[in-house]
Every structure is written in C-alpha cells, then in structure tokens.
C-alpha cells in the first residue's frame, strides 16, 4: 500500500497487478487516489493500467491448475491479497513446498505450471479465479468484462489492459492457435463491442 500511495503522489501513471478480484483491484486504486489527493493532485491525472495473468487454455482442468499456481505465486509475494478476500492458505509454507517439490524459481515462473498447480491443489477454483483469467476465449472475455464493468461502476477507467499469457508462449509464437493471434481475434473484439454497447 505504501508503494501505491507513493505512486499516486508522484507518478504520471501506475500499472497494478493484483489479480482479478474486484475487491483487491478497487482497494488498490483507492490507495493510489489517496496518494494523489494527499499530494494535492487530481486523482484523474494519474493514468491507470492493469495486468492480468491470463490462462487461455481450452482444457479447463489444466487451465485451473495453472491458475492455482498463479494464486500461489501471489500468496508467496503478497499474502495480503489473500487476506483481503478472507482466503486462508491451507497448506505448507510456500518456501517449504518449493524446496520439497522442486518448484523453481517460484510458483509464477515454474517451467511446468500444471505440475506446480497440482502441488497447491488445496487452493480452491474460486481462489484461483481471483488471481487469473482462466479458460477459453468466451470464459476469459466474460471474466474480463465483469472486472471492467465493476471498475467503471466505481469511476475507474483503465488506459491500458494487459493480458499476460500463462504460460509464456514459445518464441516465435505463430499460427492461428497462438496466443498472439487468438487474443486479438477471439477475445478483444468481443470485449470492445460489449464495452461500447454498455458504456456508450
């Protein structure tokens, strides 16, 4: 929170990455705006961006396991994001799990996110979906729209929305099944159309 408040006080723009749950998103923006106002700035002068871990995968069980690994990574580095939502960590300490199960370097960057997600399968699907967009193109479009609608209802407009691919795509990422082609073809048009219709 102190870093967010400081950013609100001095930055032209702030990117946040706090998962997909609106409570964590709204509380983070509130702190940024408080920092701006305490510094005598108009909060609207602070441009906002948001990053979502995005598991675009049509095999929902594997996608959910990868999302559980993402949730574990958030708990590992920012446990307050779990606490804010009333979530409990019902497993061993993340450092113990990483050491015993050979997760390297962490739950966000494991080379096998399905395997690392299986290690933290005590994380519920609800919890996993609070920290990542998960599923096929329709699932992700719906989840993203719900977040953006809630933000708009609270006076929040994001200048930039980044869908960070999970896992990292190969290089080069080419072809009709690639993340780089699927997102602009299957997700972004539907989201833009829905927003233009509902928000004018």
Question: Which residues does each PLM region occupy?
Answer:
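Short acidic active-site motifs
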Residues: 2-3, 59
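Receiver (REC) domain switch/active-site residues of two-component response regulators
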Residues: 12-15, 159
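Alpha-helical segments flanking ligand/cofactor-binding loops in enzyme cores
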Residues: 4-8, 145
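Alpha-helix-loop-beta-strand connector modules within alpha/beta enzyme cores
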Residues: 181-199
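An alpha-helical appendage that flanks or caps ligand/catalytic pockets
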Residues: 25-156, 195-199
